[in-house]
């Protein structure tokens, strides 16, 4: 029963090793391990072939030849797998997720309320392309808003004031690269889509 599990790993290009005497009492299992930030191995996914529970519960099926057969049960992690994956990613990136993974990809920072219509217009274009954003409409100083976005590890901050609205541009700051200067909405969108589609860190 180990051979099919190893074939699955091989087809998925997963480097494997046989853990002698590590199988569960009910049958062989496949554990997907990863190294955390401390270099320690943790299990992220488990798939197990259970050869005991079907008998214990009296489970049977009728095979194509009409005979009764005892099924094997496949255990797998489901919800725990997602939780462990999220924990791994949060730990690895320390909350500074790459753009493609960040829950909030863009933070718009209008300098004053009168710039909100322009920001909303640009935000609608980005939203149509699948970009996730928020607009910081708080009555706070711009420097404070930028600092907050940096502390929250938002990948991009978009600042819009009179000059940007008049020239149909945006002032762009990147968490990773700092001040990127002025861009049109089309230029910004091209950059974002390239970074997301290529899964850039």
Protein language model features and the residues they cover:
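Generic structural signal for residues in well-ordered beta-strands
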Residues: 15-18, 133-135
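Short beta-alpha junctions and helix-cap segments that line functional grooves
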Residues: 18-20, 29, 45, 144-148, ...
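Broad gene-expression machinery/nucleic-acid interaction feature
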Residues: 27-31, 56, 103, 153-155, ...
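Short glycine/threonine-rich loop-to-helix capping motif typified by GTGT followed
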Residues: 10, 26-39, 115-117, 146-152
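Generic long, charged, amphipathic alpha-helical segments
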Residues: 93-145
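Single conserved hydrophobic/aromatic residue that forms the stacking wall/gate
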Residues: 1-14
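C-terminal structured "cap/appendage" subdomains that terminate the fold
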Residues: 123-192
């Amino acid at each position: 029963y180990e051979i099919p599990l190893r074939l699955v790993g091989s087809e998925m290009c997963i480097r494997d090793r046989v853990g002698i005497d590590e199988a569960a009492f009910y049958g062989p299992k496949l554990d997907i391990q990863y190294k955390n930030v401390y270099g320690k191995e943790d299990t992220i996914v488990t798939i197990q072939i259970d050869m005991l529970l079907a008998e214990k519960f009296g489970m049977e099926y009728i095979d194509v030849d009409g005979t009764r057969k005892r099924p094997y049960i496949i255990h797998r992690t489901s919800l725990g797998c997602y939780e462990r994956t999220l924990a791994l990613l949060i730990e690895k990136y320390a909350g500074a997720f790459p753009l493609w993974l960040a829950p909030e990809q863009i933070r718009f920072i209008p300098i004053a309320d009168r710039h909100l219509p322009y920001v909303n217009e640009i935000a609608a274009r980005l939203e149509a392309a699948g970009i996730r954003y928020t607009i910081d409409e708080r009555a706070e100083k711009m420097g404070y808003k930028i600092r907050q976005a940096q502390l929250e590890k938002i990948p991009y901050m978009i600042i819009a004031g009179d000059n940007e609205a008049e020239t149909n541009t945006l002032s762009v700051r990147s968490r990773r690269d700092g001040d990127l200067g002025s861009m049109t909405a089309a230029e910004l969108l091209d950059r974002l889509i390239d970074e997301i589609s290529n899964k850039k860190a």
